[in-house]
Amino acid sequence: MDKWLTSNLVSGSVVGVDPHTITREEWTPLQTALSKAKMQLMAVDKNLVDLARFQLKDLPPERPHNNIMHLPIEYTGKTSGQKIKELRDKMAEKNVSALVITALDEVAYTLNLRGSDINYNPVFFSYLVITPTSVVLFWNDGKIPQDIRDILMEEGVDLEGRPYEEITDALTKIARELSENGDGEHSIWLSNEASEAIHRAASGEGDLKKPLNLVSEMSPVALAKLVKNSVELEGFRQCHIRDGVAVVRFFKWLHDQIDGGTAVTEVQAADKLLEFRKEEKYFMGPSFETIPGAGENGAIIHYSPSRDGPQREIRANDMFLLDSGGQYK
């Protein structure tokens, strides 16, 4: 993109970008490339595409805010309190005063919570900010269900809830307070893959009385997730067994149907596989939309059969591609 912009725009051009939609890792090289071409990269206050959609009465979809659930220690092998203690130890090693977690899977992992805001992904739209004395979840309207709060309190986490939209203002406030109360020794840790908007907020929007360091590197949660404990490993093994049973039962059913002369469409096959998976213990849902490609359809990347109109039947002499997955506790 930077090559196209520098080749097609004249010197002195200003390129506007919504900082919520681009990571710091993407922003920095783009800014450098434009600067070399005597151009400017500017963060726009409001997303211009969204503004246009409002004017055209084609409203952007609302952000989902489905219920969240807690995953007990028999599945995770570690309480959220243990995980947060380890993160605070890492923070102390780097002498940081706040850790900002922006990746949705990392928030879910840290708190042992799961959601369903994104299809086929057990995550929920949120941010998590950890300090030596507080744990704040920016989620939905900030009203965390009491049962979730009680469970986390039992695990040693006094979770505070704040509205999702308040994250940038909250980070700016934290940055300014750390700057005013220190002498350059305070810092905030956040991943380079966080949005440019989050980085700007954590920098106090450039309005700090004293220096504030930003530790912009891989999140410690990402590293913690790499090392699986014994409970997680055994969970993986058992999930593979259960899912394998469902898939074997499905193929046995499919062969029986076709050998017996019963017509089976791609859609019917996908639905039957889901039925078998639902019968397995701890099944939570598919991990992506099943791809049941019969014959020539098996060559189509990310194929998805239509439920409307004619249905492709799976014939006895067809090559049949089945790409599917399940998620379990």
Regions found by a protein language model. Name each.
Residues M1-K329:
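Active-site neighborhoods and metal-handling regions in enzymes and metal-associated proteins
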